A protein has these predicted regions:
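C-terminal motif of bacterial Sec signal peptides marking the signal peptidase cleavage site
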Residues: 16-17
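Sec-dependent signal peptide recognition
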Residues: 2-9
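Short, conserved catalytic or interaction motifs in soluble domains
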Residues: 20
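A structural signal for conserved, well-ordered secondary-structure elements
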Residues: 23-172
């Protein structure tokens, strides 16, 4: 009986104290990368993830991201990153496909789709005009509005993405 009490008194507190740490590695990088090549679903702007080829360099690096608001899907950037994107210009970015990646693995894809466009985009999109006018950009579903018939998968709040941003103090 004394042995059982010993095990209970010794090992249970030891097991409780050995909490498993589920932190992500600190070298996780979230980036926006332009696509060099991709295919779309027939009759749609939906990008087939299996077909994408990422550009070698990132358009928006992790160090450029100040914060992300999961409720509004807004990314807040450094002033220098915002200025660099504004300098590229909405005309050059409009229609360009991108991927949000974690360590160069796509989480979701989308397009830079300017608000001056009269074309519909049935996929994830970012208005490049926002780079010249605000300190943030919003990742949206569908342009000019979202309709359930578009069947756009919503990975904007991917749990691994949120965990990385939370760990690094970049989640609003």
């Amino acid at each position: 009986m004394k042995i059982i009490k010993f095990y209970i008194l010794f090992f249970i507190p030891l097991l409780i104290a050995c909490k498993h740490d589920e932190q992500l590695p600190s070298n996780q990088k979230v980036e926006f990368i332009l696509l060099d090549s991709y295919e779309t679903k027939l009759g749609s702007k939906a990008i087939l993830e299996s077909s994408i080829i990422l550009n070698d360099s990132s358009l928006i690096e992790y160090s450029d991201i100040i914060a992300y608001d999961p409720e509004t899907h807004r990314f807040f950037l450094t002033a220098s990153a915002n200025q660099a994107l504004a300098k590229i210009g909405s005309e050059k970015l409009h229609g360009k496909a991108f991927a949000l990646t974690i360590n160069r693995e796509p989480v979701y894809t989308g397009y830079f789709w300017a608000a001056f466009s009269s074309s519909i985009c049935d996929w994830v999109n970012v208005d490049p005009l926002s780079f010249a006018n605000t300190t943030f950009f919003e990742v949206k579903l569908g342009y000019p509005w979202y309709s359930p018939e578009m069947q756009i998968p919503d990975n904007r709040n991917d749990q691994i993405l949120l965990d990385i941003l939370q760990q690094d103090g970049k989640l609003k």
